[in-house]
């Protein structure tokens, strides 16, 4: 079976968030089960692909040329789509993002002949199921929602001038939502199957509270909606072989974890107390502001905080301020540092994730694999992966009191080492999720 994956991100070539980890890992796992996988991503600035030729697509009344490049990683072929729009410093954050990714998808559609199935990821690939239904290419389509909050919304006049699509697709093709083009809705309505990244999140997005304005659409399409829990790259995230750890360790010998902890605290001047790690984007979704509000209570509980992350400038400034005020108890490192992230997962005693919503979450899986019990809000994929008092700690309230309660539960557990060992025994590999996707693919292709 030949399967094309279309995404704006794929590790290790383009990563902003967890989408990249999924698209980088799932095809590799599927290849081990007999799938011939190809990943299509934009040819971002700095990617050193092998140029193989040019392609053409119709856009805004003219004929547009795009470059085609190839890369390989983990036995999977990557196809790079070269457009001038993507020769920039970062994948997103530009006023013309919508237009850029519409062009990307129209170019990709020209190369999808011969695939049995096309697996589209988030709004940046959500137009493709409609293009398939309009006859641009053949093969079945799966659309995966990684984060419903980002929907790809734009005015209709520009869109139809660019694409030349039939005007009746505005309503009949599922593009219209609340008076604008909504690519997320388009993908949901037109794909043969819709998945999201955890069973709990698949339910949450059908509710008014979690549906981001699309809950009615999702309820109407519930018959083809399925939650498949993401896996983790357990070869990369492995405390026994981690290249970023000076002292590796395993479930049978935790001495390397204790050495990593001692060196981490000493290097950053933290007191020898229970230390809670945070590795996160500073975004409203992640509940980072709740940690700030909980700082006085957490200091009274006697824990340290070690925070690595960046994002909203006001949160960065606030963490820098509290870290300065609580020297020896709070460390804040701005930005993302891969080696330091590994040391935090390994060297902290607990790991905090107070997310407002969390489609799946990978950090809690990594923390458990590294023997660091996660303290998480009971939402989305966190519910599906963490068992309270068994492999970690869950709290309900979306406020500073909830954060305090979760950390206090962690502190009062009589055998936190057993919780850590239970977490290390969990299987978060891609083998099971890949099998579930393969079952889905086979069913769709057989009835295509």
Language model region names:
Residues 1-448:
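Catalytic cores of nucleotide-sugar-dependent glycosyltransferases that transfer UDP/GDP/TDP-activated
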């Amino acid at each position: 079976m030949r399967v094309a994956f279309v995404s704006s991100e794929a590790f290790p070539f383009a990563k902003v968030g967890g989408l990249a980890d999924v698209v980088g890992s799932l095809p590799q796992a599927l290849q081990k089960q007999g799938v011939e996988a190809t990943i299509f991503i934009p040819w971002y600035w700095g990617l050193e692909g092998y140029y193989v030729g040019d392609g053409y697509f119709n856009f805004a009344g003219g004929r547009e040329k795009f470059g085609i490049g190839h890369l390989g990683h983990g036995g999977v072929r990557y196809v790079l789509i070269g457009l001038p729009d993507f020769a920039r410093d970062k994948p997103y954050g530009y006023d013309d993002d919508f237009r850029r990714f519409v062009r990307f998808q129209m170019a990709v559609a020209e190369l999808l002949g011969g695939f049995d199935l096309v697996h589209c990821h988030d709004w940046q690939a959500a137009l493709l199921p409609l293009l398939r239904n309009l006859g641009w290419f053949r093969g079945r389509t799966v659309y995966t929602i990684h984060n419903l909050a980002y929907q790809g919304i734009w005015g209709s006049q520009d869109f139809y001038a660019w694409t030349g699509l039939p005007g009746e697709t505005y309503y009949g093709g599922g593009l219209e939502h609340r008076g604008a083009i909504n690519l997320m809705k388009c993908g949901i309505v037109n794909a043969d199957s819709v998945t999201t990244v955890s069973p709990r999140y698949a339910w949450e997005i059908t509710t008014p509270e979690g549906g981001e304005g699309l809950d009615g659409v999702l309820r109407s399409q519930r018959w083809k909606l399925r939650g498949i829990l993401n896996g983790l790259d357990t070869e990369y995230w492995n405390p026994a072989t981690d290249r970023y750890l000076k002292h590796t360790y395993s479930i049978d010998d935790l001495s390397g974890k204790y050495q990593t902890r001692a060196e981490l605290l000493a290097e950053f001047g933290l007191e020898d107390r229970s230390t809670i790690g945070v590795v996160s984007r500073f975004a409203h979704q992640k509940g980072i502001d709740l940690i700030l509000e909980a700082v006085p209570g957490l200091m009274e509980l006697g824990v340290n905080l070690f925070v690595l992350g960046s994002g909203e400038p006001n949160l960065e400034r606030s963490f820098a301020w509290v870290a300065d005020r609580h020297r020896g108890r709070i460390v804040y490192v701005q930005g993302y540092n891969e080696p330091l992230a590994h040391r935090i997962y390994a060297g902290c005693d607990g790991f905090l994730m107070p997310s407002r919503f969390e489609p799946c979450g990978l950090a809690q899986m990594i923390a458990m694999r590294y023997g660091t019990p996660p303290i998480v809000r009971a939402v989305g994929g966190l519910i599906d992966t963490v068992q309270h008092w068994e492999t970690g700690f869950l709290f309900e309230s979306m406020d500073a009191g909830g954060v305090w309660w979760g950390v206090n539960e962690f502190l009062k557990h009589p055998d936190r080492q057993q919780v850590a060992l239970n977490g290390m025994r969990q299987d978060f590999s891609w083998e099971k999720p890949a099998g579930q996707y393969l079952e889905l693919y086979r069913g769709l292709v057989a009835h295509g």
